Every structure is written in structure tokens, then in C-alpha cells.
């Protein structure tokens, strides 16, 4: 139920700031890897390879601060937030909750998809660490 409310709230949140064009929505669902546990400081390693420098430039400003992507919106279930949901324009910090801003696949996925479609996109992300695919992600039709 919480996921459904999150999705509806996200769509309402974004719909007021968009034109009448259809919105590209991507669902990101998974376990701990989808949560995203990478520290922001790991992004500097992208500068070590000429092939990944363009990606780093899409993620960070020239001064090393995180870019905020105006055409990429995200709504993410976040237990560290009082409301249980963190939403806004995509930037560093939508990874797993904790003391420091973290990143997950939402960052590069969102940047790549927005660049590919050339339109505003919405990411709806939900992930839980420590879950079993065998039990926690089984559809009700799979039986006991």
C-alpha cells in the first residue's frame, strides 16, 4: 500500500510542473544493490578513464559539487526520512539512507535515460536490503 501511495504522490508531485506531453516513468525495484551504497567520493575515479570522463561531467559541476538535473525527477522510499519518501530533482543522495550522501544505480540510469529520450523523466525507486528473492519477492500466485 505504501508503494502505491508513493507512486501516486510522485505522479502528482511531478504533474504540476510538466507540460501535457506523456511522462516517461521508470520503476527501479530491487534489493540492497538497488538501494545504492556507494559513497559520493567514489565518483572521482571516473576521471581516471577517458571513456568515463563524460559521465563524470554529467554528474558533477566543474567545482566537484553534484549537479541537480532539472529534467529528471525521482521519488524514492527512504526509511531515514520522517515521511518515508524522498523526492525531488535527481542528484547525489538518493542512495541508501545513512550519514553521508550515497549513490545507487538511479543516478547514472536517470541521466542516461533522460539523454536517450530527450524529455523529462520520472524515476520511482524502491529497494530493501536483506531480503530474499525466494520469499520476499514472490508473487502471491506462486503459492507458499
What is each residue range found by the language model?
Residues 19-144:
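Cell-envelope and extracellular/periplasmic
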Amino acid at each position: 500500500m505504501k508503494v502505491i501511495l508513493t507512486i501516486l504522490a510522485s505522479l502528482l508531485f511531478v504533474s504540476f510542473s510538466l507540460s501535457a506531453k506523456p511522462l516517461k516513468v521508470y520503476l527501479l525495484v530491487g534489493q540492497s544493490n538497488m538501494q545504492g551504497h556507494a559513497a559520493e567520493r567514489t565518483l572521482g575515479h571516473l576521471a581516471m578513464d577517458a571513456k568515463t570522463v563524460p559521465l563524470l561531467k554529467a554528474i558533477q559541476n566543474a567545482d566537484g559539487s553534484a549537479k541537480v538535473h532539472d529534467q529528471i525527477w525521482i521519488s524514492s522510499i527512504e526509511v531515514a526520512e520522517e515521511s518515508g519518501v524522498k523526492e525531488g530533482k535527481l542528484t547525489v543522495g538518493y542512495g541508501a539512507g545513512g550519514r553521508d550522501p550515497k549513490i545507487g544505480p538511479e543516478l547514472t540510469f536517470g541521466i542516461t535515460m533522460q539523454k536517450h529520450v530527450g524529455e523529462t523523466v520520472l524515476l520511482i525507486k524502491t529497494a530493501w536490503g536483506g531480503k530474499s528473492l525466494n520469499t520476499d519477492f514472490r508473487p502471491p500466485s506462486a503459492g507458499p
